[in-house]
Amino acid sequence: MTTFKEAVTFKDVAVFFTEEELGLLDPAQRKLYQDVMLENFTNLLSVGHQPFHPFHFLREEKFWMMETATQREGNSGGKTIAEAGPHEDCPCQQIWEQTASDLTQSQDSIINNSHFFEQGDVPSQVEAGLSIIHTGQKPSQNGKCKQSFSDVAIFDPPQQFHSGEKSHTCNECGKSFCYISALRIHQRVHLREKLSKCDMRGKEFSQSSCLQTRERVHTGEKPFKCEQCGKGFRCRAILQVHCKLHTGEKPYICEKCGRAFIHDFQLQKHQIIHTGEKPFKCEICGKSFCLRSSLNRHCMVHTAEKLYKSEECGKGFTDSLDLHKHQIIHTGQKPYNCKECGKSFRWSSYLLIHQRIHSGEKPYRCEECGKGYISKSGLNLHQRVHTGERPYNCKECGKSFSRASSILNHKKLHCRKKPFKCEDCGKRLVHRSFCKDQQGDHNGENSSKCEDCGKRYKRRLNLDIILSLFLNDM
């Protein structure tokens, strides 16, 4: 037989709770504790019969107090299990020894019927096998990994491990495990009851604090206020993120364009702009997006009902935030001001793009010619020069344009609309730029003088034509 110095004891697998800790356990947790402790006894003492149930120290849903390892060392004589009362120290070693004594007959039978011992072992050696739990002897050995075990029940699982057999299946999700102890640990996931439930949406939460935060979405309550600007937030974590806006702390910097961000996930999203990758595609219209969240938001345009409508123009939106942004157009509010020139903007994104004019930053560059732009949309328009793309077609004459603004101006020629009027002569014009040129003709700003003959021309173009003709004659 193979002998090991260290024995597997009840202390190695037992879970100890104080009286205060036991009072905090809910029924599901108590049931889980019972199952785990029962499995611990089974793994170490399973011989097919167990006359003493390890949870006899549960009486009227009150746990008997188990002493710690220090208390066991100093306790020379204690009460028997039957004599110990509730909340009295019941030595774990005493439970161990009495249980092993009760199992002598059944364990002796299994040992005799197993191949614990080699041929030639005498009956006295079999008798010695009854104390294998206390001595730490592990006579059984796995032939594949040479690991030794103290009884047949513990000897079997390693064989299941080598064969890959998973005979223990979870009834909740169907997942299988080699060991029943692993199954017990897995079942703790299902035992975590979701105690908190939202009354509005019916969504369940494992913590009451998460439920309170969720309910504030419906009630509009924002108890956490920023001391700098007074803005309110539903939870403290969002307030902490907001406070970084005032401190200016942006530790995450993009290596390509130098733009800084408060959080690392913001930097990761930003870096997709430089790669140009758009892996998420809408199945309905074919439009592609960099982020899955952007695709999900876009899909609502096709599927979701537009519950939020503008009172001014009746336009519908799927999100209240989009409606709020749209209403700024009707109010004319421009809350975002440039500190350099004082120009105002409706959106913070517009202000950010405008500030690049002052800083000279052009993070978007054309791969064909290297020309830089302050916005992604500007780069997209420029790339049509190289590709020759003209997606905007006039239905009247079939003429194509690369910009939406160009086709809008072109359509005015067909409908004969002349919305712009010269303040000096009253002449109506198609484009605003024509109106400015007309006013320049009246005040003399557009006139150009020839240096050779002194004659003045309304347009610089007319002067250039005359000069070219004069040079050809020479």
Swiss-Prot record:
GO MF terms held by the record: DNA binding; DNA-binding transcription factor activity; zinc ion binding
Keywords of this entry: DNA-binding, Metal-binding, Nucleus, Repeat, Transcription, Transcription regulation, Zinc, Zinc-finger
Domain of life: Eukaryota
PROSITE patterns: KRAB (PS50805), ZINC_FINGER_C2H2_1 (PS00028), ZINC_FINGER_C2H2_2 (PS50157)
Subcellular localization, as worded in the UniProt entry: Nucleus
Record SUPFAM superfamilies: beta-beta-alpha zinc fingers (SSF57667), KRAB domain (Kruppel-associated box) (SSF109640)
ZnF locations on chain (C2H2-type): 168-190, 196-218, 224-246, 252-274, 280-302, 308-330, 336-358, 364-386, 392-414, 420-442
Protein name: Zinc finger protein 230
Region called KRNB, residue ranges: 80-167
Cysteine disulfide links: none
Entry-linked InterPro entries: KRAB (IPR001909), KRAB_dom_sf (IPR036051), Znf_C2H2_sf (IPR036236), Znf_C2H2_type (IPR013087)
